[in-house]
């Protein structure tokens, strides 16, 4: 071992020691004031060391990436779907596609157990499972002409598991879209400022699309500056309009109204050409995403806030007010996207590999973008932990959990205002008393004052994680840049999240439409035609109708839809990740690299253990704390039967909603179990079949060398 080689590793070893020291401080300090800075430094050190060593090991030993091999983008370069793209541009594109609302919401919900469990899982999960899955799927797909996950399972394991996987992917897509839409609805309900600002993004995106296509083609920088100026203006004018005596009440909508508006919007936008609304919004969202997260990290370094949430709360036993379930397995399902996410397998196959200019970029894009997403999740966890824990619980606990009834805020205006304000005052007093009795002291005045600071009528009943994160962002940005008030920064946070989510909703509805056309095309060939308007309208209507139904059920759920849909989303998302890792294992076995399969088998087994355990509990547990699907449905059926004439029509309707939701969730859960375990069965069957065959049996496309003179990359796509 020569000295030069050894010296190269010294800075990395020091970085590792620094990360370990910071993590130890985060983990072991109790009762003292812990700065949020420890978490930020620990995370960055872990990411850098993991990227330098573990991802390099996977690239060189497990995959043996080959820089001389031409990628699908180079071989099939058609200027449309296959375009060799600059690696930094593609990193931004890929990151924008994978970082939906998951890394923003899951960690905020997980903070009810304290900041420590979430931090540890986000770091360990991404290094050993999440980034490995993204990297692996991107590599396998780029060696199969950019095939989608379902197609690759079909090629490597057979037609039956391929069709099952397609079906499973589509179902998971529907749940993801319903959950994403639910978060937007919860953030915009009863919020005129939010409604105005988020609705403004549609004409802004359309204007940018037309500007880039016809007025000034190719001027990406110029149009992005105009877009950002218009966005900031929309936040400012949103505040003016919200306080207007006429427009304020006129733009205050009920959650069901926003639900139907969103369903209509998604249907139309999925049928429009990509350049008109999707691409420009993608640019805006990517600038905003990376800008806000980097800004938040710098803000935390400048103001060095203290973590107010305890490291571990009493709720690790599973009795938390936001969601029920003990630390194992439920924490690993609540934090879906920052640590590991199956949804990424749908982006890393089919979309990104068709744009990759060189095979060696897969490490930077596959492993690197997932580390970036984990950092987003860490920032969300920190933002939720630096606000008062009492405020955190008051905002996120459903009204029923606080023992309060929320007044109808959309009826504000005129003579009703004083009455509703009095009701809000009473609700805040109740909420403060309840939360304080749990050991997180807060006064009714603090709850009312926070609402006033952020320019909203109330902060109660703001579940879904988005408003909490926006309050955290507002706290940091307001201290660093005090010229703008808290209301501006809060709505800036809401806009940031809504843009994140609407981009994912647009792209997801498009992808879901193609999946449905693919699935139904097996039975009715005409529906497979992606260029046919009729088939497109039918596919889009089917996709939007399915997630719209789940969304509506979640919105009218009296127990708060996030509570019922989020566990299902987390479980299905992690199961899809397990399916992707099973495919990775099968491909490694067929490539005769069996000695490395621990890289994919270990995370796959862990995910299967967590998801199966959680689903078993959610389906069959009779513990009232856990709110199991069948248990809840039966309980409410009995209540309806026993209540008889004493129940009002509204109460019966509410109870029926709960029964329907629980049966829907149970049905979907059983379907997921069947999908995942049948794919594992076929995976093992394939392994047995190829075990004794000499030589490789995988379906990789033949080797084509990189053209002489290198590859020209595009910097905009």
What name fits each language-model region?
Residues 24-30, 35, 82-144, 155-159, ...:
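Membrane-interface helix-loop-helix modules in multi-pass membrane proteins
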Residues 156-174, 366-378, 463-465, 483-493, ...:
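Loop-to-transmembrane helix boundary motifs in multi-pass membrane proteins
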Residues 56-83, 109, 123, 132-161, ...:
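Flexible loop linkers connecting adjacent transmembrane helices
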Residues 1-16, 49-104, 286, 325-326, ...:
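Membrane-interface "cap" regions at the ends of multi-pass membrane proteins
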Residues 300-316, 371-472, 507, 551-557:
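Extracellular/periplasmic helix-exit of transmembrane alpha-helices
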Residues 190, 209, 213, 229-260, ...:
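Hydrophobic alpha-helical segments and their helix-loop junctions in multi-pass secondary transporters
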